[in-house]
Amino acid sequence: MKEKWINALTLAFTVALLPPIWAVLSPYIGVTVGAVALICAGLFACLNNDIKMAVPVSLGFLCGDIWAVIATNVMVASNLGANVTVYLTLFIMGGLAVVIGTLLDKLVFIPAWLAGWAIGLTIMGPMDVTNLGTTPFQIGAAMLAGVWYVGVVGDLFQKLLIKIIKK
């Protein structure tokens, strides 16, 4: 079998097997935003599931999650008009994320921070800020599941399958 098809079919099997397990089990551990894992796994896959990047990507996603909570609270507290508030919040916090991320570039992957922020805002933005409850923690758990379970474990599983097939 050609290398291309070995990679494609083992990846197809890995994608068919592992993410659905997360999708089924995540609500049982209190995570109602399980699909976030797939988004985060997709970004991690763009880095070739490089395990050396797993920690900076994870920290970036978690920074984005925290950033979304802060932004949501800032936007609710603002007396400015909705459009001005959204613009200024995104302008200031986006710029700060890049500057802080650059200072911490060995620890935090900036694109993950920005993507995590967007994910968090998409989920929490429409919510009543007083009812966020465990939502930020659920988002963070799903982000980590995307990187570590779907990304790292998935990559190791696929490599194992390839090794078995090539024997």
Task: List the model feature ranges, each with a label.
Residues 54-63, 84-88, 107-116:
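Cytoplasmic-side transmembrane-helix entry/capping segments in multi-pass membrane proteins
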